[in-house]
């Protein structure tokens, strides 16, 4: 199965669930307290990170998706910290503030990357009326988020989870649930559940073989009227189950495991973002599995960005080639540059590909390790060359260019010049054929300002698209 990272900036996700604040106190330990047989930690660093459903939303935003977060908080300093931190990373918060209840906060004390103690500040929101959350959900769903995540830590925000599932389904949203506890009946009708193995076996019983896990998982799908079930299995990876389809077993991609805190949040957020951006279930689960392998190598609740995810998915393999969207190309370029590869970019109409074009593109590719060709849209060619051009529409021109061995990536631009696109991509080297001065080449100033270089290459004499068209017309 070929995996391509989707355009996460197109994903719209609504997260509803138990919001928390994770606090971390870091410091060295050099002695034992004279008051009790416990280590003394000299606190030198304090971190505050969104946790629980807030960490799920943070993970969606880290991939570039648009996310709205709904949950219960107290009227306190911890809630203000959460709102401020989430706003800074473009997470839209729509919290329900509950007087006389503290925002759920977990304080961890660490020394030399080892957790020594955790203190929980919470009363739990059990029994709180869900009307306000349901109203906020309805308002958010009218803005058409394509995927809804229900992040359940059994703290009370999802007390009426069945009503939430039915509300989301009225808007034809995909509903993903990260469950808690052994009462899975309340999640009936969701699109997909993501229990870990312990949670899954607490519901269906101990599974002694792969066959048993699959059979019981499929039975659970039927019983709860689900579309799919994704069982996360720690060092054994994860398994995607769907009725009438073969199970998909994905081995773990974790290289080192430092902390599993928040790994489940990362899985469901990448899964949701990928589905919202157009990935299939298989592709979305593969990406979520890769992301989990990255995040467990970090300390505490954390996120995975597109570069880390691309590295995990592609490793030392090719990121892919051919015709890409702008977001896909930006990711491909960042990953190539991250590996130390030199990215070259050029542009043109390339209406009827001829020997001069091929020679020029080969020379351009020799200047670096990767070659991008930006191609004028049909209207752009028409504006430059006049009526009757292009002879070949842009999809055919790009397909031919993508088939050349010298070319890695091809992209269309619709403006008169590719200046905006080049400024977004920022290749290491920008090349152009003809009698240009480097400072006059569109996008050149931006490339140079970024530390790149601009070069002018020579076209092969005697080759011209206009002359080819003239010859064809004269002979017809």
Swiss-Prot record:
Claim: Metal-binding is one of the keywords in the record: no
Keywords tagged on the record: ATP-binding, Carbohydrate metabolism, Kinase, Multifunctional enzyme, Nucleotide-binding, Nucleotidyltransferase, Transferase
Active site: 265
Keyword ATP-binding in record: yes
Region (Cytidylyltransferase) residue spans: 345-476
Region (Ribokinase): 1-319
InterPro entries in the record: Bifunc_HldE, Carboh/pur_kinase_PfkB_CS, Cyt_trans-like, PfkB_dom, RfaE_dom_I, RfaE_dom_II, Ribokinase-like, Rossmann-like_a/b/a_fold
Binding site for ATP: 196-199
GO BP field: ADP-L-glycero-beta-D-manno-heptose biosynthetic process
Classification via Gene3D superfamilies: 3.40.1190.20, HUPs
GO function terms (MF aspect): ATP binding; heptose 7-phosphate kinase activity; heptose-1-phosphate adenylyltransferase activity; phosphotransferase activity, alcohol group as acceptor
Pathway: Nucleotide-sugar biosynthesis; ADP-L-glycero-beta-D-manno-heptose biosynthesis; ADP-L-glycero-beta-D-manno-heptose from D-glycero-beta-D-manno-heptose 7-phosphate: step 1/4; Nucleotide-sugar biosynthesis; ADP-L-glycero-beta-D-manno-heptose biosynthesis; ADP-L-glycero-beta-D-manno-heptose from D-glycero-beta-D-manno-heptose 7-phosphate: step 3/4
Record note on quaternary structure: Homodimer.
Physiological role: Catalyzes the ADP transfer from ATP to D-glycero-beta-D-manno-heptose 1-phosphate, yielding ADP-D-glycero-beta-D-manno-heptose.
Protein name: Bifunctional protein HldE
Originating organism: Psychromonas ingrahamii (strain DSM 17664 / CCUG 51855 / 37)
Lineage, opening ranks: Bacteria, Pseudomonadati, Pseudomonadota, Gammaproteobacteria, Alteromonadales
Gene: hldE
């Amino acid at each position: 199965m070929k995996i391509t990272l989707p355009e996460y900036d197109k994903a719209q996700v609504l997260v509803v669930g138990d919001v928390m604040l994770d606090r971390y106190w870091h410091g060295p330990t050099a002695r034992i307290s004279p008051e009790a047989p416990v280590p003394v930690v000299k606190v030198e660093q304090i971190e505050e990170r969104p946790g629980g459903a807030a960490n799920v939303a943070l993970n969606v935003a880290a991939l570039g998706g648009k996310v709205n977060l709904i949950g219960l908080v107290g009227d306190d300093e911890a809630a203000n910290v959460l709102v401020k931190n989430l706003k800074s990373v473009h997470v839209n918060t729509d919290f329900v503030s509950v007087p006389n209840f503290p925002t759920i906060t977990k304080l961890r004390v660490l020394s030399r990357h080892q957790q020594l103690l955790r203190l929980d500040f919470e009363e739990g929101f059990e029994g709180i009326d869900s009307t306000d959350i349901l109203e906020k959900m309805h308002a958010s769903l009218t803005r058409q988020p394509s995927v809804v995540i229900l992040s359940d830590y059994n703290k009370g925000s999802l007390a009426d989870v069945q009503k939430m599932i039915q509300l989301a389904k009225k808007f034809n949203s995909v509903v993903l649930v990260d469950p808690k506890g052994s009462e899975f009946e309340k999640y009936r009708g969701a699109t997909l559940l993501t229990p870990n193995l312990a949670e899954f076996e607490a519901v269906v019983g101990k599974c002694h073989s792969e066959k048993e896990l699959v059979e019981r998982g499929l039975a659970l799908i039927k019983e709860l009227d689900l579309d799919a079930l994704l069982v996360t299995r720690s060092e054994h990876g994860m398994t995607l189950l769907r009725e009438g389809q073969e199970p998909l077993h994905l081995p773990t991609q974790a290289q080192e495991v430092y902390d599993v805190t928040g790994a489940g949040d990362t899985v469901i957020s990448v899964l949701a973002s990928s589905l919202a951006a157009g990935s299939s279930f298989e592709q979305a689960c593969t990406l979520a599995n890769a992301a989990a392998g990255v995040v467990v190598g970090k300390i505490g609740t954390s996120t995975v960005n597109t570069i880390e995810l691309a590295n995990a998915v592609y490793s030392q393999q090719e990121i892919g080639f051919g015709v890409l969207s702008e977001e896909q190309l930006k990711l491909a370029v960042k990953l190539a540059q991250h590996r130390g590869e030199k990215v070259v970019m050029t542009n043109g109409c390339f209406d009827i590909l001829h020997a001069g074009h091929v020679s020029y593109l080969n020379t351009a590719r020799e200047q670096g390790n990767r070659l991008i060709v930006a191609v004028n849209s049909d209207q752009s060619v028409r504006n430059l060359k006049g009526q009757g051009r292009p002879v070949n529409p842009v999809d055919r021109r790009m397909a031919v260019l993508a088939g050349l061995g010298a070319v890695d990536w091809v992209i269309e631009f619709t403006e008169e010049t590719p200046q905006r696109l080049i400024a977004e991509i920022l290749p290491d080297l920008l090349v152009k054929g003809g009698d240009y001065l480097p400072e006059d080449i569109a996008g050149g100033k931006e490339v140079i300002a970024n530390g790149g270089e601009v070069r002018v290459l020579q076209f092969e004499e005697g080759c011209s698209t206009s002359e080819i068209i003239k010859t064809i017309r004269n002979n017809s």
